[in-house]
Structure formats: structure tokens, C-alpha cells
Amino acid sequence: MSDLHELCGFQTRPIGPKYIEDLKFYLKNGIPATYTIEEAYNYTNNIEEEPTTTTTPLHIICSHIPNDASNDEIDIINQMVEILLEYGAGWCLTDINDDTPGCILIRRKLNNTPIYNQVVAAGVRAELLLRKVSEYDMEIIEDTDDLNHEQFEGIQGEETTEEERKEEEPSNTSDIIDEQKVEQPKEDLKEDPSSNQETYLKTKLEYKDGALVTKDRKDGVMMSWETDLMRMGCDSLFKGASIDGEIDDEVNILNIGFGMGIIDTMINNKNPTKQYICEAHPDVLAKLRLDGWYEKQNVVILEGRWQEQLNKLLSEGNVFFNGIYYDTYSEHYEDMLELFDIVVGILKPHGVFSFFNGLGADRQVVYEVYKQLVEMDLANYGLICKFEQIEVPESTLQLEVQNSTDNKSVWDDIKRAYWTCPTYYHPEARFMDV
């Protein structure tokens, strides 16, 4: 463990301004804000392999914030986190427990602190910066490549001079590196139906009790535990069916992604003028036909990807919707951004847009980041998004049911739990001037 790591462990109390001075000194002398305990250990023990975990100074701080810290100490710690983030500390790097700094704060019930808010804000900035970098196909150089560990050994905090304390321009690129580290290899992603839309549409699906899954891999495409969330979505869509308390003459509802048909059944029970269902997967389309959806008088099935089908509707300009719901599988946030561009063209001025909000829902801090991103991105399209916060059923959060022969986890026979957050943020978006 280096002096930087020891500093972030708060071995000396009280935590005062000297901590900030020493932290700045280490960073200004070339120790990266992402320098990990694992890298220091490997160097000390002459291990050449790349470490598989990344316990950074930010992890150490979040793990060692004293439970009895005074307000003054919390203020110093908050400044230290701010400095580390300015120098490129990775907000979503994971330690030996697969925890990000934000995960540690949540586990320690410190997610109502300014420190946690800083971590979330760093995630938002990183995502926005990553988008901009991706536009220009820029190469990112990792700031821990070719580290001179011997140089770090000679750095002593007490040798700081006034001149060395002058502000320097910090680097902010390592958050992008964090994003890259959590990605799978591209060749794996291409064959993964949960990550690649083209692969998913060629993958056989299976309807089983309470779930729609990929037949061979058992990826959870949709599950019945989502029913209450779908009911909220349906209720939101029909809020766009009235103007000043008067029901619209023509109530048109669009759902993108049929899945198990949970929300579409709810929509149909409310008897809209027209119910549009956009679905691309051949097995799901076969289910639609088998269950008689093609014969329902007020239902229009749009066969194919929404990217093609909705652009046709937009070009024709003959139908506009009181409510639009989006819940597809194997698409990404970039796809949602493309959808926003179409939504504003086919949504009635008093209409409501909603979606199944599973963005980053396998890690709470990432879920918080995407909540803020959605608000910002929809605002750019003239939509204001409000979130209703509800608690997710306890059974959904139980990956395993211990000491029980009767109960089963909802995730039994599912490849991976795609939801681990205790809270669901239900989105409801309208045009700002409504």
C-alpha cells in the first residue's frame, strides 16, 4: 500500500486541512487518482500480471469515512473526493468485492451525503463526455500505463512547498476508461443476445411460467414480477387521453415491445380508439397471432423494428399518440436517444411518454446516474420527465431463498438477475408547456 492509499484510510484523526495538502501533493507529483492497491501490491511483490480488481483511493475513502465524523471532517473528506474526481478518479471502477465507490457508500447508508452526490454527478459527466469522445472516435490513453512506481516511493507529503501547492490543470479522462473496463470484449458482445439486437432477433425464445427467456441461454427477456410496474406505465399513458378534463375524441396508444403482453393487455382493457403494438421478434409475433391479437378490431400490429416502423408513421403524419410506452430487449441508451427524436414527432401535445426504467438497474449508483441523464436528455427534446419512486417487491431482490422448500427465487432458472435496486423510478414525460 502506498502513502496515498494510507492517507485515504484516515488513520490519523481529526481529519483536517493537512489531508487535503498531502493529497494534492501526491497527485501533482504524478500519482494517478486511479492508482490502485492492487498495482502497488504487484509492484512491491514483483508480480507482472495485470490486476483484475481496482481498489482506488476513492474506494478507500468511501470505506473509511468514520461513522462518528464531525461536520468539519465530512467537509474535508468531501473536498478530497472532489479533488480526486477532478484528477480523474474512476467513479465506476470495482474493487475486490465488485463494489464501486458509490456501492460502498450505499452499503454504509451514506448515499444521502454530498460525497455520494459527487459520485453520481461524476457518473453523469463521464457519460456525457464519453458520448462526445465517441462522436470523434478519439483514442483514450489509460493514465496508469507505464507507471514509474519507484518515483512514487520517493514522494513524501511533508516535503510540499508553497509553489507545489499551486493549482494545476487536472485530467478528466479516466472516467471514460472506467466505462471501457466494464465492457465485455466486442466479439462476446456480438454473440450475446442481451447486448446485440441482431443476435437477439435470431435467437429462439421460450414462454415459461412467469417469464419470457432466450431458449438456450435463459436470459430473462421479461418477467411477471414487472406487472405492477407495467400497471403504472399503463395508467401514465392514459393520463394523455384527456385535455382539460375532457376525453380526447381519438385515443391512440403505442407500445414498443410486446414481450409477455402484460401492459398491452392492460391497455386493451381500457379500450382505446387504436392500440398500436410494435414488435420485431418472430417468436413474439407468433405469440401475438396465436393469442388473437391480430383479430382485435382496435389493434394495429407493426411488424419489425421500431427504427423502421415508427419512421414510416412519422413520414406519413397521419397518426399521433396520446401515450407511448417503450420496453424493448437488447437495446441500449443510445437507442433511446434515437427514439426520443421520433417520440416528439408522433406524441400529441398533451400526450405522455413512459418506458420501463431498467437503465443500470443491476447497480443502484448507475441507476441514479441514468435517472439524471434521462431528465437532461428529455429536456433537450422539450420534454419534462417526472419520476415516481416506489419500492421494488422484496422477492425481486432475493437472488436465493434460504432455508425454504416451498418458496423459490423469481430468478431461479434465469441466467442473470437484471434487477437488484430496491427502488424503481417510474418515468412520466410530457411536453414542457403542458
Swiss-Prot record:
List of residues binding S-adenosyl-L-methionine: 200, 230, 258-263, 279-281, 306-307, 327
PANTHER family to which the protein is assigned, alphabetical: GUANIDINOACETATE N-METHYLTRANSFERASE
Top EC category: transferase
Enzyme Commission code: 2.1.1.-
Limits of the RMT2 domain: 193-434
Entry's family note: Belongs to the class I-like SAM-binding methyltransferase superfamily. RMT2 methyltransferase family.
Biased composition (Basic and acidic residues): 178-193
Function statement: S-adenosyl-L-methionine-dependent protein-arginine N-methyltransferase that methylates the delta-nitrogen atom of arginine residues to form N5-methylarginine (type IV) in target proteins. Monomethylates ribosomal protein L12.
Protein name in the entry: Protein arginine N-methyltransferase 2
Domain of life from the UniProt record: Eukaryota
Recorded GO CC terms: cytoplasm; nucleus
Residue ranges of the region described as Disordered: 155-198
